[in-house]
UniProtKB/Swiss-Prot annotation:
The lineage of its organism: Viruses, Riboviria, Orthornavirae, Negarnaviricota, Haploviricotina. Glycosylated and palmitoylated by host. Glycosylation is crucial for glycoprotein export at the cell surface. Homotrimer. Interacts with matrix protein. This is Glycoprotein. Residues 20-459 are virion surface. A lipid is attached at C480 (S-palmitoyl cysteine). Its main location: virion. Residues 523-533 have a biased composition (Polar residues). Arg-352 is highly involved in rabies virus pathogenicity. Its mutation dramatically attenuates the virus.
Amino acid sequence: MPLNAVIFTLLLRCSICLGKFPFYTIPDKLGPWSPIDIHHLSCPNNLVVEDEGCTTLTPFSYMELKVGYITSIKVSGFTCTGVVTEAETYTNFVGYVTTTFRRRHFRPSVNSCRDAYNWKIAGDPRYEESLHNPYPDSHWLRTVKTTKESLLIISPSVADMDAYDKKLYSKIVSNGRCSEISPGSPFCPTNHEYTIWMPESSNPGISCDIFTRSMGKKATKDGQLCGFVDERGLYKSLKGACRLRLCGISGLRLMDGSWVSLPQVNNSEWCSPDQLVNIHDFHSDEIEHLVADELVKKREDCLDALETILFTKSISFRRLSHLRKLVPGFGKAYTIINRTLMEAEAHYKSVREWKEIIPSKGCLKAGGRCYPHHNGIFFNGIILGPGGEILIPEMQSALLQQHIELLESSVVPLKHPLADPSTVFKNDDEAESFVDVHLPDTNQKISGIDLGLPEWKRYFLIGVSAVALLALSIIIAVCCKRFRKRKKSKPGPVELTRKVSVISKGNGPVPSWESYKEGTTGDVRNTTPSTRE
């Protein structure tokens, strides 16, 4: 937590609520003085605000800002754009195919975008396949349209979350700001009607991981919670606290600028817009532990000084300074008047600047006036120097001053105005460069016969084609008829054999080979006897 209520309490002024941190305490109510014995001296308990009377301590758990919490809460997300890619093919009469690609957009659904994103981060091959344009189909003399509805995912797309109202701020969302992401509204509209922004996690509440649960002791009075001792042992008062939500968690902003979520706290007063929460980072956490150690050490120093006083039976102005209450509230003040130890009831207030208590030289402002001194002695070790200047033993602590400067530079801004109107795209072409393609199922539509000609030319071409086809049919029919006629008038090979003629001995025609053979044999037979004769 930032600077604890160890240094604050119920009666801090409004300036303290707005980020002013004290480094010294001085009585705003003092007196009357009464003599006391040296044995009545006591060291104040700076870890408890005594005037609240919250003495009953009970262990309990509470939520506070996690150490290391930074002002800018980054929420990783992605953009989802609906795109319809259309491939139109036309095949003309001679088979020439013309393909035209067109793109238009549509507003995607939340569930489809979530599924597409899961595909992408899981490395599903279907997502890689969907990156291509639709494969165009074609039919002769027809126009074919092939379309794909694509969900284009861009990731990461980081937005800043405002811890106060869980609104998201990004340059791409509408007006640079988006209301809280919830189950009823799981997306943010963007500057483009067809694009939505969604968180990477389906449960965006985990993005606001800035809280941690700590153990402490709640301080009650008559059963009423009025403060608590935090995990580091420092008391924090609930006086002056106001209700404030961080990341949707209801809690209390304490007067020191810290934030806690306590159970069973009824406070109807809400914080004003200028009451912000201090950051709890590693540096402030380290200093906080040093502050707690310093307070413990100062109490030990006070006890050592008190032991020395009681042992030596003597007291000095410097030792009286150890008895000053470091926490605003009721306590004791001590001084020495005419060598007599004096005590007075006092109510301490916080001091931010030295000029608050030393407005001019020689004036120590306490109780609303320049407090009178007694022989140059004021109280709590404060004296008047030889030159008339006020001398305070405790100069401002360098450690506390370092803590103050750290806290003043570590206030969470209420808004993160990252919206830049100049980044709004004027047309669709400018938006194409920030999308990746995811393509689901394909739809095809096949038109009727389309020659790509005007109406009269199309019918004229059909008529000419019909006449040409008829003429071609007639020519083919005539050719076929002539071919058949020629084939029918040509003799066969058997008939040609039978018509072969031979010449006989008497030079007469021989009708056949058999007749020729018979004729030749007869001649041979007739000539044989004569030869013998």
